């Protein structure tokens, strides 16, 4: 048995209310559409996580809602703007099941995605890890605690622009 990790950055958020804290910013219309499209893609491709580790921010919670996955979320305050090292630590200590979705923020999500793979995908978008980007990684291990940077094998990488019509 191998493990599967789905790393996702939250969808596009709204900056329309300057009084909101960064933590409380919601998704904008484009973000909701992008997250829905990613959720549809995940279902079509058979990516159904057993567990979700999600930042507590409003935009990550709303992104997760728009994905419409059949999984119980675990909201973790330490995932809010976590570094790649902190993300790995949370995964090693909190992940359960064969497949886990980790939903967070840049720059940590981008750095984590780059560090976890043995070989990055050939995609200009990968290094930027734009909003609602999804990386699916497989590991030849059965224990989340054994994960290390550089061990993951690319299964898929997608961004909303690959799924939605351009306007």
Stretches found by the model and what they are:
Residues 150-167:
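Charged phosphate-binding loop/patch that engages nucleotide di/tri-phosphates or the phosphate backbone
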